[in-house]
């Protein structure tokens, strides 16, 4: 999701790498699930997120899309996101005790919260959001430990590649709207269906490693 932000307004003003320490440790979020409520369609999922959910829940992507996930247009491209459910607008994976039922394989956005990503120059750095988490007694922890992600450098490159791949597509789709000779709606739908089919719906290899190759994913 493309956002124009002022880091001075939403963060502590610093940019972090995964080797830095930041006040992210919420001590297990004991008694709190605020960040799992009222998120609308903002928890957009990348292909690895969906692969992990599908594999660990033993459900096809199409099955997930009829339950805890949904599709929405994000800057001109149709992408999946976590669905908020029930009257309290809670994440579909939140149980009645306010605990995450997919915590071990939760999506990347959930995994890094209350951190965000600041993208530039085909890469990104982390920033600490200061208004999003109600916990005031957070402890400092090394970011790579907080992320708890295997092969972190490879994963971070994948995240950057995926972000800028989508950004380039989204800019192309948005520019079509200003071309009176182009079938912008039809082209946007075709691009969206290609992204969904190629990167989300078509099964990856059993180890999912082909997900790190955004331009030429290996299929089985």
Residue ranges and their predicted role:
Residues 1-183, 197-211:
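Hydrophobic scaffolds flanking metal-cofactor catalytic centers in soluble metalloenzymes
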Residues 212-220:
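Residue-level detector of conserved catalytic or cofactor/ligand-binding positions
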């Amino acid at each position: 999701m493309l956002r124009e932000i002022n880091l001075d307004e939403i963060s502590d003003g610093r940019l972090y790498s995964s080797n830095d320490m930041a006040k992210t440790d919420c001590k297990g979020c004991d008694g709190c699930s605020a960040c799992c409520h009222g998120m609308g369609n903002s928890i957009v999922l990348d292909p690895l997120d969906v692969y992990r959910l599908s594999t660990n829940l033993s459900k096809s992507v199409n099955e997930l899309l009829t339950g805890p996930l949904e599709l929405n247009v994000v800057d001109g491209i149709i992408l999946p996101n976590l669905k908020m459910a029930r009257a309290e607008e809670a994440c579909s994976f939140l149980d009645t005790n306010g605990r995450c039922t997919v915590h071990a394989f939760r999506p990347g956005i959930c995994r890094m919260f209350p951190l965000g990503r600041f993208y530039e120059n085909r890469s990104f750095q982390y920033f600490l959001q200061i208004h999003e988490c109600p916990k005031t007694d957070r402890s400092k922890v090394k970011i790579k430990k907080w992320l708890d992600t295997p092969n972190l450098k490879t994963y971070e490159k994948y995240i950057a590649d995926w972000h800028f791949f989508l950004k380039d597509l989204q800019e192309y789709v948005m520019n079509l709207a200003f071309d009176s000779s182009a079938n912008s709606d039809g082209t946007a739908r075709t691009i969206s269906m290609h992204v969904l089919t190629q990167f989300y719906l078509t099964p990856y290899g059993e180890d999912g490693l082909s997900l790190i190759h955004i331009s030429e994913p290996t299929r089985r």
